[in-house]
Amino acid sequence: MGSFCRYSVVMRKIYGLILGLMLLCSAECSAQYNRDYFFWVGRKYMMDNDFKEAIRTLNILLRFDDDAYEGYFLRGIAKYNLDDLLGADADFTIAIEKNPVFTTAYTYRAITRSRLGNYDDALNDFREAIELRPDLPNPYFSRGVTRLLNQQFREAISDFDNFIKYEKKVADAYINRGVCYLYLKDTVRAYDNFNTAIRTNRENPASYNRRGALYMQQKRFDDAEADFDKAIECDSSYVLSYFNRALVYNETNRPTQSLRDLDKVLSLDSTSSITYFNRAIVRTQVGDYNRALDDYNRVAHYSPDNVLVYYNRAILYSHLGEVKKAVADYTKAIELYPDFANAYLGRSNLRRLLRDTAGARSDKEIADRKIAEYRSRLSDSTYSIYADTTRRFDRLLSFDSKMAGSSFERIAARRSDDDKMTLLPLYRFTFIKDDSTHTAVATTRFHSQRAEDFIARVGNPLLRISRSTTNIAPDSLIAIHRTHKQATHAATDDKAWISLFELAISESLIKQYTNAVNTYTVAIEHNPANPFLYLNRAATRAEMIDFISSIDNAYQRISIESDPASRLHNSHTRNYDYDDAIDDLTKAIKLYSGFAYAYYDRANLLALSGRLPEAFDDYTKAIELNPNFAEAHYNRGLIQIFMKDTRKGCLDISKAGELGIGEAYEVLKIYAGE
């Protein structure tokens, strides 16, 4: 019996141990399953090109498993595809730190650094990747592209040679090697490589386009046209071949066909500055002056620092009899390039027509002096272009052309006048109905127990703190306002401020801003130590200013134009200031120094007042209180771009994108390469 008891005790211990191990393994398997699940979902989003959702999913994975280097790697790829190059570089770096033999991470970080123009570090990463896995072909290809961009043509050829040893059926390798030979002025080998690329893949339009461009360069226009036709046959949306074929048509005196192809390019890419420029020239040649002027106006909008736009438009204005406008354009061309002798001569002739004899004489003397300098320095290509009076500036430009003052980039991706990047709006207490969007967003917000207690004390189920004003229909807002107005009459003294607070919110939501500010003021008199009342009065005061200024058609906001150093501007003569609203937020901060939203709101108003360094400090304080404050990262990033610290600004905006701000990736597309 005793032996049986001992046996049963031992068995119970063994059973308990087995059960514990089973539970432990089950927990580990569950955790592993979850990690694998998020990893799989992240990859699935990436395969569907939904990179923002991929980042959100991978963020969850990395919160639970900080050592998941593959998660950082995948998130880096997602950021790369959203043009968040700095963010991608940071994630690839973490992946490498956690796994120093992660060859693919070295390769992708190198590609990212190459796009950032950081060629030395990119080449170092490629070297690491190749040393780790010399049998992998892709690093050779990518390093070859980087060396090509860095104008190391012979070294690039060597890399493409190594890639082709492993992968003989990749047409792009032959195209790139051919381009290298072309830069080395070895057109025979360039043709050989382009021909091989075509034989390797007869459906690849890039091969025909490259060979056609070389034919065109050698004035073999029939052969060039045939290649561009074939490229378009392979891909009817291949922009480069339409563009190049338009050049061929123009060279062979077929302006109608040239215009048709340029129209097609613009239907595929409506922001291509160089295409508008070329179409303006062709339209001028056929006498379609008014539409040519429209095209020049677009180019001046997209590339405002381009000297030839103003010079050619001045000539066009002269044809149209707009002499004063022509003079203004010649003047602009001279401002952009003071050695432009032809512009002085053109302006001199027009000033003579306007009977400005002294101005005409002065321009002629300056032009003569520039021409004399040119003739004494014929070896200087700058003088040979702009001081040569025999040179014409009405030839079509290729995609590789560069013009003084700015370069026409390939398929320029400039923004329209209305597409401006603004600060994300203020936070305030408002009425919002629960919906899935608000709930999803709210989970990432700053938690303040004091604010939660305040909401609970008010006791209104619609009360939320948000940067969205409301999602309630206008008719419902009017009914809510009527209810709260009646409630204020019945409120007891100890709860009067609550009724007044709710009434003020409803008044601001129906745009009765003056009434709302007055109501908040009365509420503050009843409860002067409540920071949230000051926060809302500040938000309402700021919103009232914006509303008034919008009526004057002069929004006070930060906008980033072509020049990243653009200033805060207000096009109207009236001035609006946010001093009272800023004072309210300062009071709120004194009453509750740990409230991140108050610093964020004050930073916004300081920025709109042109006080950028102070705004930067307040955004920084908000981020210290809430490191995952996405809007604060985004707005601080914009401020840093305005203060010409583009790299740090992009890092902040990258973080904002990682935290779910979709607008971040639009900004990064513009500034990723700066």
What are these model-derived regions, one by one?
Residues 47-48, 81, 115, 149-150, ...:
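Register position in tetratricopeptide repeats
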Residues 319, 339-500, 505-507, 548-577, ...:
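Eukaryotic alpha-helical solenoid repeat scaffolds
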Residues 40, 74, 108, 142, ...:
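Canonical tetratricopeptide repeat
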Residues 64, 98, 132, 166-167, ...:
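Structural marker of alpha-solenoid helical repeat scaffolds
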Residues 34-36, 69-70, 103-104, 137-138, ...:
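Helix-start (N-cap) detector for alpha-helical repeat units in TPR-like alpha-solenoids
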